[in-house]
């Protein structure tokens, strides 16, 4: 079985969870990883095959989402290009940890995610 594990890199929570999940998946299946979001120095034991820029959320000083900045400062043409280039069709299973590029690619390609 071939599995794609897609991880959001905002913060360290998703990546910390991945550190525990990756070895378990590798015991039972062939695993490839993609990431999206801001560059992060958190080291995964398994290197991602691809990193996408994805979508960035911008926040106000009090921690809520700044919707104006989020809407206007993301490059949606690049995002669409990333979605269309994400190879979701070559996997038997996609595990998605809040990673938007593979999720949208799976939706557009009628692949369960």
Stretches found by the model and what they are:
Residues 1-2:
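Nucleotide donor/acceptor-binding cores
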Residues 5-9, 31-79:
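Conserved nucleotide-sugar phosphate-binding/catalytic loop shared by glycosyltransferases and other
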Residues 6-19:
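A short, glycine/small-residue-rich beta-strand->loop->alpha-helix junction that serves as a flexible
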Residues 21-29, 42:
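A short, Lys/Arg-enriched amphipathic alpha-helix followed by its capping loop at the start of a domain
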Residues 26-33, 89:
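A generic structural motif
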Residues 41, 94-109:
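An aromatic- and histidine-rich active-site surface loop
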Residues 64-101:
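Conserved nucleotide-sugar donor-binding subdomain of glycosyltransferases
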